């Protein structure tokens, strides 16, 4: 009877060891995925920052052109 119990216990221990090994592999895969996603997020944030800077530059240029046009329109009104 005790041999049978030991065999059952051994099987359960082996199953637990196998489960732990599988979970460790899954954790490693998730860590790699997390690292890739973090890198992608950083790249996206950098790209977003560049786009925001370009948009601000375009707004500044537009404001400058509008000011110049208003100045020219003002001079045209003075001439009339």
UniProtKB/Swiss-Prot annotation:
Cellular component per GO, a single term: cytoplasm
Pfam families linked to this entry: ZapB
Composition skew (Basic and acidic residues), residue ranges: 49-62
InterPro entries for this protein: Cell_div_ZapB
Principal subcellular localisation of the protein: cytoplasm
Compartments in which it is found: Cytoplasm
Segments of this protein annotated with the region Disordered: 41-62
Recorded superkingdom: Bacteria
Annotated keywords: Cell cycle, Cell division, Coiled coil, Cytoplasm, Septation
Coiled coil, from the record: 3-80
The keyword Coiled coil is assigned to this record: yes
A single BP term in Gene Ontology: division septum assembly
Keyword Cell division: yes
Similarity remark: Belongs to the ZapB family.
Function: Non-essential, abundant cell division factor that is required for proper Z-ring formation. It is recruited early to the divisome by direct interaction with FtsZ, stimulating Z-ring assembly and thereby promoting cell division earlier in the cell cycle. Its recruitment to the Z-ring requires functional FtsA or ZipA.
Subunit structure: Homodimer. The ends of the coiled-coil dimer bind to each other, forming polymers. Interacts with FtsZ.
Name this polypeptide is given: Cell division protein ZapB
Source organism of the structure: Aliivibrio salmonicida (strain LFI1238) (Vibrio salmonicida (strain LFI1238))
